[in-house]
Amino acid sequence: MKRLFAILIILVATAQITLASVRVEYVVPQPTSVQSGNGEFVISGKSCLVYSGAVRDAALYMLEYLPFKQILSSSKVMPGDVQLTINRFMAEEQYRLEVTKDNICITGGSYAGVFNGVQTLMQLMPVEVYKKSAKFPISVPCCVIEDSPKFGYRGFMLDVARTWIDASRVKRYIDLMAHLKLNKLHFHLTDDEGWRIEIKSHPELATIGGFRGGDSPVFPRYAKFDERWGGYYTQEELKDIVAYAAQRNIEVIPEIDMPGHSKALGAICRDILCNYTPNTSATNGLDIRNVWCAAKSSNYALIEDIIREMSQIFTSDYIHIGGDEVDMSQWKKCPDCQRLMAEHNLENEKQIEDYFIARVTEILARYGKQPAVWNEAIEGGLLPKTTRVHGWESTKKCLASTAKDYPTIVMPGEFFYFDMKQSASEPGHNWAAIFDSRKVLSFDFAKAGFTAEHMKSVAGIEASFFSEIFIAHNPETNEYLDYMLFPRLCALSEVAWSRNKRSWEQFSAAMNKAHFSRMDAMGVTYRLEPPKVTYASGVLAASVSDGSILYYTDERTGKSVKYNKPITTTEPHNYSFESRRGTGKSKTTGSTEYFATLKPAVTVTTSIPCSSRTPITNAAKYGNSIVRTTRAAKSGDWIEYRFEKPLKCREIYAQTGHIHLRRCHFLAGYVEVSYDGENFTRVAELTDGGAAVVSDKAIYALRIVATSRSDAENQVVIQSLKIK
């Protein structure tokens, strides 16, 4: 009996080890070459982590995830050990991971290559590794993986200027990048909405410019309009972020966006702006200029102070200096900038930007740095070919940059701007495209028009997240940002790393069978594909294809329960569905009837003058047509919707501002309705510029009334009503 019990213990232990291993075909991103072997290697409590060469930091990194009792600097390896070593004859980020029954050996061309191998090894282990709670023994399948990246620049741009994200959370996203072998963090530190970097010679830039709203001279935008909100990174915090990223093979490339996108700086350093008095009649007296004057020598002295201190913080050879979306009308109105044009024989204001960036480039060179810019900045034709260009506007702009032999980071918004909606009914922008991870994975250089000659100037690929909308989605938590990034960032890693392009089916299999579970362990609130919902013959049915669990909600009660079988109903519009799995979830969706809206004939009028390009009649067209006024709102302004026939409906949602963004809207106000066409009753208060109205009576007219000025824009956006 004792012998039988001992055998059972051995069998159970073996079963546990077998369950721990992960199939090599589910590594994300897909390696270049994989040879599966027979058997497995077991890391035990007696295994030693042995390293040779300058990879001690990689060994220490592994200790954060794996409970090795001993790490050792040695070229000698004993059976049962895990070895990290460098082979200088390999390419810098190349690695070889060999797992035999006796040992694991990761060999890289440099620290970067070894670290890449570590990430692959971790993906062959149980997901508990990512919880930092794994215990030995751990089994790893025998294999030989030889791998190297397609591009040396595999980046992600994080905008912390528009929505503040503290240092600990930035480190979290650095960790998530590292797990996907992404190696460049483009750190968008300044914009119209905030200045996030401490400059000790000019402390007010951060201590004042890092906050908006309340008593700050930086006017609030996008949300949190009634409080002083924000933050900034001290230089010590930034140095810590840089070091933390470096251990994870990630280079931090800071961005100071100029000469445009500088409204926050202009609000606290008025002298950087052009030498004229702006007309503020359309903005309730607010000066909303956001462009550095290119003619003031004092501006270049300030820029030098900033760059001097940045060069002591950031180890990257590059500092991104912006160059996008510059409102050059401010230079046209500035006598000093016009005089500059004449003195330097500049043909147009675009060449003023060239002049400005050339001056900043000279400053960068004095501190051993090179410039990176957005693609608009090269349109003047005068920037040196060493300038690195980030092509964001379109693939055509990326092609144009590479055709001019600029080293180009390919990041067209329609594929790689992860602040875009993932479907029509989800949050996010839609100006570039509406897309999910399938489209990200589909990016193909050849199909986009890149020839072999173009590819010589492609330095890499980058995704970005601009954070205007994040501030309206509980920005103190990671849920919204996670949902927007994952699994799109996983798909980006495939495009940036893998030479052997995965099909959508192969990618989905890797996610469903392995990587979603890894992200569960990482605590990532990732997006799942939404359920497919159908309604026919009184039966409402839903299904998923990724193994997630379906739930439905009865909108009348708000109760959410697990979906087990089709629902018989004559009111499909009352039911919504979502899928859940681990820490992931899908968007809320429903049948066609759930999304159906009414579009009754309506006449719209307003007390605010409207642009002839977007007349008030647009608000009666429904859909995505909008109206732009020619000034901001004042207290007492109104927008009225008068129906051709009295309207009976379930709900009316009245919204000012952009459809997807809390901007250009009434900061405070209310909605009133008329049940007789003459007298109005106040029925709802505005929240973020909008309000829902529910009535059991027929409504003749609805009016949105402002009780304060609108936000810090020179217009109000008027939408059509959303009626159910």
Which sequence ranges carry the predicted segments?
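Flexible, acidic glycine-rich loops studded with aromatic residues
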Residues: 371-376, 383-387, 393-545
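Feature activates predominantly on carbohydrate-active enzymes
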Residues: 90-301, 305-318, 359, 363, ...
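Bacterial Sec-dependent N-terminal signal peptides
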Residues: 1-24
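Trp- and acidic/polar-enriched beta-sheet ligand-binding modules for extracellular glycan
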Residues: 661-724
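Active-site neighborhood of glycoside hydrolase catalytic domains
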Residues: 270, 283, 287-386, 392-395, ...
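Acidic, contiguous N-terminal accessory segments
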Residues: 20-152, 371-378, 474, 517-524
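Low-complexity, disordered linker/stalk regions enriched in Pro/Thr/Ser/Gly
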Residues: 510-627
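Disordered, acidic Ser/Thr/Pro-rich linker "stalks" and the adjacent N-terminal cap
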Residues: 591-649, 655-665, 669, 685-686, ...
